């Protein structure tokens, strides 16, 4: 069986599971869709605890990235974390395995995939791209067989090429970015974008239908975004917004 068929078969199994009903609470004037990419994961437990306290379910895009513990985010040591998130009703999607970046389409059915900052790169054909997108899902499924996985993917940095989008569609996956006001800013420099400023901006700008993006922790940010995350959640709820996981076909962004 090819890796492409394996991916499509795995997604079919995921989609055959009952979808979690999402009923908007009274007073909800529209949904927002919180998505979390893996990242450095330093604040992962803190963020997960906040989500749990407020009953927020998110869509988690997984890649095998280096973490603050010296391992990688889809190594066996992280299995308890991912199992707990699946049990809480969060849903999952692929963020590529290596978290490299798409840099161009050198030929039809080919896409250049390069490590951040240069250095290693390779040209992926259709089968290799499907395998790159399938691998994090396969690793997650081994750790958390009950995890609900959506037929979506997110390119690292949100950077795509026309070829990568077409080829991923052939793997059965639709790309999911984030909306203009959904970039929460946890990757920005703390000196230029302190938490207080990010909180004010996000509470003022985010409205119904936004797809939000953040990480389980960002290595280069000295002022952890997790310090204001609970205030952001409660502030958005106070404005009548309700958190939902992404639908299977994604949301325009």
Q: Which role fits each region the language model picked out?
A:
Residues 1-13:
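N-terminal secretory signal peptides and thylakoid transit peptides that target proteins
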Residues 14-18:
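N-terminal signal peptide c-region/cleavage motif recognized by signal peptidases
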Residues 22-28, 53-54, 58, 221-253:
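C-terminal domain-boundary segment and adjacent tail
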Residues 22-110, 117-121, 132-151:
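Active-site beta->alpha N-cap acidic-glycine motif
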Residues 35, 61-63, 93-95, 153-156, ...:
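A cross-family glycoside hydrolase active-site/sugar-binding cleft signature
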Residues 37, 51, 156, 212, ...:
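Divalent metal-coordination and catalytic microenvironments
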Residues 38-43, 64-77, 100-103, 152-162, ...:
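Acidic-and-aromatic substrate-binding clefts and catalytic sites of carbohydrate-active enzymes
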Residues 159-205, 241-252:
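His/Asp/Glu-enriched short active-site or ligand-binding loop at hydrolase and phosphoryl-transfer sites
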């Amino acid at each position: 069986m090819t890796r492409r068929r394996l991916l499509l078969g795995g997604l079919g199994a995921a989609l055959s599971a009952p979808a979690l009903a999402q009923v908007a609470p009274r007073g909800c004037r529209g949904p927002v869709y919180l998505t979390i990419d893996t990242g450095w994961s330093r604040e992962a437990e803190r963020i997960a605890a906040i989500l749990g306290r407020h009953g927020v379910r998110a869509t988690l895009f997984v890649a095998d990235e280096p973490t603050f513990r010296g391992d990688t985010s889809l190594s066996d040591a992280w299995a308890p974390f991912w199992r707990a998130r699946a049990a809480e009703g969060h849903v999952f999607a692929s963020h590529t395995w290596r978290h490299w970046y798409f840099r161009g389409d050198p030929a039809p059915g080919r896409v250049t995939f390069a490590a951040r900052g240069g250095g290693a790169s390779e040209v992926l054909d259709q089968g290799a791209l499907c395998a790159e997108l399938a691998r994090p899902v396969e690793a997650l499924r081994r750790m958390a067989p009950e995890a609900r996985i959506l037929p979506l993917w997110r390119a690292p940095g949100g950077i795509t090429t026309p070829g990568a989008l077409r080829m991923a569609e052939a793997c059965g996956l639709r790309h999911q970015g984030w909306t203009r006001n959904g970039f929460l800013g946890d990757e920005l420099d703390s000196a230029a974008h302190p938490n207080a400023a990010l909180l004010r901006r996000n509470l003022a700008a985010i409205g119904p239908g936004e797809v939000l993006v953040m990480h389980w922790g960002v290595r280069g940010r000295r002022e952890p975004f997790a310090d204001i995350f609970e205030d952001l959640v409660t502030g958005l709820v106070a404005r009548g917004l309700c958190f939902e996981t992404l639908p299977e076909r994604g949301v325009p962004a």
